[in-house]
Amino acid sequence: SLAFVSLPAGWFGDWHPAPQRQFVLLLSGTFEIETGDGESRKISAGSVLLVEDTQGQGHRTRVVSEQAVQVAIVPSSPSK
């Protein structure tokens, strides 16, 4: 089911895999995501990510904007 999440300015989520394959729609703010292979990208409002790293180290995320990040999370398939 659709979930809305707010992450405050300065928030940091250490390494974690995604709970399931899902789309993340960035509604406001900017965050930086780093993958296990060392790739890092800044993602801003209006972007849509397909998160598929459900196994292993996963990714880490940091809010880099001065305002909170608002995201909508949409599973790509029903949970089992």
Specify the residue positions occupied by each region the protein language model found:
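Active-site scaffold segments
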Residues: F23-L27, G46-E52, A72-I73
